[in-house]
Amino acid sequence: IKDILGILLLVLFLMLLVLFAPDLLGDPDNYTPANPLNTPPHIKPEWYFLFAYAILRSIPNKLGGVLALVSSILILILMPLLHTSKQRSMMFRPFSQCLFWILVADLLTLTWIGGQPVEYPFIIIGQLASVLYFFIILVLMPITSTIENNLLKW
């Protein structure tokens, strides 16, 4: 009974929010008149694609940016194939642990840059973070796995 009461109160609250104050949680920039010739600066993808959007914007060439965007997402799908370490866990692999946290920091930086306007300091930071993203995944992770395989005598 108390679960049904909680669900009904939640539904009531959401209905009141939607029916009486639909703009309460919206973005006020959505009400500015649009220029059909360019994309407004407040338009950006959802938060989980902001890292890929930052990589897209970091390359001035349109085709190169799109290829980098697609490859940044495909790399995440192909990461299990790039994992060459004999030991699956990172518990006894301190180099891989450090590299993982550097990659997490780089992804957070790219996500932050993807939400920023295209201005001077953000462009350079986005380009450096994009290069670091691909360098960590394609170069440093396989090298680190090989070194740790040799250290662990696998």
From Swiss-Prot:
The chain crosses the membrane at residues 1-21, 63-83, 95-115, 122-142. GO terms for molecular function: metal ion binding; ubiquinol-cytochrome-c reductase activity. The keyword Iron applies. InterPro entries: Cyt_b/b6_C, Cyt_b/b6_C_sf, Cytb/b6-like_sf, Cytochrome_b_C_euk/bac. Keywords: Electron transport, Heme, Iron, Membrane, Metal-binding, Mitochondrion, Mitochondrion inner membrane, Respiratory chain, Transmembrane, Transmembrane helix, Transport, Ubiquinone. GO terms for biological process: mitochondrial electron transport, ubiquinol to cytochrome c. Its main location: mitochondrion. Its cofactor is heme. It is found in: Mitochondrion inner membrane. It is a multi-pass membrane protein. The keyword Kinase does not apply. Pfam families: Cytochrom_B_C. It comes from the Eukaryota. One of its GO terms (cellular component) is mitochondrial inner membrane. Binds 2 heme groups non-covalently. Component of the ubiquinol-cytochrome c reductase complex (complex III or cytochrome b-c1 complex) that is part of the mitochondrial respiratory chain. The b-c1 complex mediates electron transfer from ubiquinol to cytochrome c. Contributes to the generation of a proton gradient across the mitochondrial membrane that is then used for ATP synthesis. PANTHER family: CYTOCHROME B. The cytochrome bc1 complex contains 11 subunits: 3 respiratory subunits (MT-CYB, CYC1 and UQCRFS1), 2 core proteins (UQCRC1 and UQCRC2) and 6 low-molecular weight proteins (UQCRH/QCR6, UQCRB/QCR7, UQCRQ/QCR8, UQCR10/QCR9, UQCR11/QCR10 and a cleavage product of UQCRFS1). This cytochrome bc1 complex then forms a dimer. Belongs to the cytochrome b family. Heme 1 (or BL or b562) is low-potential and absorbs at about 562 nm, and heme 2 (or BH or b566) is high-potential and absorbs at about 566 nm. This is Cytochrome b. The lineage of its organism: Eukaryota, Metazoa, Chordata, Craniata, Vertebrata. The gene is MT-CYB.
